[in-house]
Amino acid sequence: MNGFTGRKVLLVNTVCGTGSVGRLVVGLYHTLMSAGYECLVAYGRGEAPSDVRAYRIGTDTDVYIHGALSRLFDRHGFYSRRATMDFIYMVREYDPDIIHLHNIHGYYLNLDVLFEYLKDCGKKIIWTLHDCWTFTGHCSHFEYIGCSKWMSGCYKCEQLREYPRSFGTDSSAVNYEDKKQLFTGINNLTLVTPSRWLKEKVEQSFLQEYPVVVVPTGIDLTQFYPYDENVSDGNLVFNIKNELELRNKIILLGVANPWRDRKGLAQFDMLSKTLSDKYAIILVGLNDKQMNSLNDRIIGLKKTNSTEELAALYSMADIYINLTLEDTFPTTNLEALACGTPVITYKAGGSPESIDETCGEVVERNSIQGIVAAIEKILNSGGQAYTREMCLRRAQLYSKEYRFLEYIQNVYETI
């Protein structure tokens, strides 16, 4: 790796090994270790895998207190002072060459303490942004409500009840100014985003002084691949189809966790009332209340923790439909493609970036008729596009190994 091996890396994230970002961090950890780097993961909640060298920042009690105070005063990121001071002491002892931040929200770090250190430490710093929280006064996403206050200064936040939820004071104005002061003026900082869309937003924010590298998220292609009914994996597909009485149906699949209107739940309700009964819509990841409120034209399934079951569902679907109204770079699109299934998505956030004209369609937001037209276009393509082979070819671009290597070559070895 061009003489860069042996350098010490500190990876920082809310969780280690769980959730999409936690799994990404662990995958990057192992890739860096294999490339000759020395690594340590610092995280704030839950447990770390046994094969990862890790440091827990604070305790469950620290997280609970931080969360409770944030709900009262809307000052997420400005508690956990002692836990963060202890963490910085450990960082000084470990003395990394590179500090790679991921999600630093999640009720476990004090921004004042952390960035006082980062501004003076002289280390190379990478910060991968997975949402928009870094440059807003409160929220992690703003596209759904069409808010642009983040471009000049937040105030009177319309999303106080969204993560990081607050039931008390609106501190979005002071949060914005504090973040702007803390997050700017850092030497040797490189930002990474998973999509061009998020890169563009960063370049319109107070973070515009920093270089931004786009490294799309990767997925595990040994877990997500086509399950055929005539081979061993296909038994699961066969059983699911029979159990849900889906024989001779055109299957349209949606997956989210959690489901909300901003993830397209209400859109699917409207779509189901537009399509004929030759179609079956399956939504995966619903809670009990949502399951009970579905109309009888939608089949609802709870969240599955089985990768095999999820891959089988993707594989048996004729089309994967993502009606999200805001997202940075949804991995469900990639998982569907990896299982050989074409994708239809709204033109929202970074969702369209994972597909091209060979494997999917992009539709203007809130256009149910546009979704119906895209469904018909894919089903009537006659093998000229949207084939399994074309979807798999596209998915190869997002193998986790390829993307982790891109991190090393395009970020670690260039800073």
Model-predicted segments: where are they?
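A charged, aromatic-enriched C-terminal amphipathic alpha-helix characteristic of glycosyltransferases
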Residues: 366, 383-413
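Conserved donor-binding/catalytic core segment of Leloir-type glycosyltransferases
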Residues: 192, 237, 243-263, 269-272
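Short hydrophobic beta-strand element within catalytic cores of glycosyltransferases
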Residues: 342-345
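Short alpha-helical donor nucleotide-sugar binding micro-motif in glycosyltransferases
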Residues: 312-317
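Nucleotide-activated donor-binding/catalytic signature segment of Leloir-type glycosyltransferases, i.e.
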Residues: 285-308
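Conserved acidic donor-binding segment of nucleotide-sugar-dependent glycosyltransferases
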Residues: 357, 361-368, 377-383
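Aromatic "clamp/platform" in nucleotide-sugar-dependent glycosyltransferases that forms part
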Residues: 325
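Membrane-proximal helix-turn-helix segments that form the acceptor-binding/catalytic region
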Residues: 120, 149-191, 200, 206
